[in-house]
Amino acid sequence: VNKRVLLVEVDNWSLMAGKKISQEAGTAALQDLPAEIATAVRFLLQKIEADHRGGTVELRVPPFGAVQCIEGMNHRRGTPPNVVELTPEVFIALCKGEITPVESMQKPGCSFSGEKADLAFGVFPLLGV
């Protein structure tokens, strides 16, 4: 099976392929979550990637996207050593400050692996969303 991965470099560093989501579009998506959950998640991941550059932790929100964040080590190939995987609903609630990182650890469908995975909790909540 021949698989190809597309990585686009935006502002010298980006793991998310595709067009940047504007502040207006991201904010509108957050206000209309049922219809726009994919755009809302991608917008929030984009903000985390821009504000918390690095490669120590991979933050995944399947099926919508994943970014590497937090300064420190850089991971380039294979399974990352520190992974946080959240459901879209839990991810958005964390970003908006509606739940705490500790509460997110108890939610079904969320997983945390690696000794530095907890560093990702420092990005929540996101200001201005």
Residue ranges of predicted features:
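Surface loops and adjacent helix of pleckstrin homology
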Residues: 71-72, 115
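Short, charged/polar surface micro-motifs in flexible loops or helix N-caps
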Residues: 64-67, 73-75
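N-terminal amphipathic/basic helix or basic patch
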Residues: 21, 28, 32-39, 43
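C-terminal interaction segments
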Residues: 2, 6-30, 81-129
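Short connector loops at helix/strand junctions that flank enzyme active sites
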Residues: 52-56, 79, 86-87
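Active-site regions of enzymes building and remodeling cell-envelope glycoconjugates
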Residues: 72-83
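Solvent-exposed beta-strand sheet faces enriched in polar/charged residues
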Residues: 60-62, 113
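A glycine-rich beta-turn/hairpin centered on an aromatic-Pro dipeptide
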Residues: 36-58
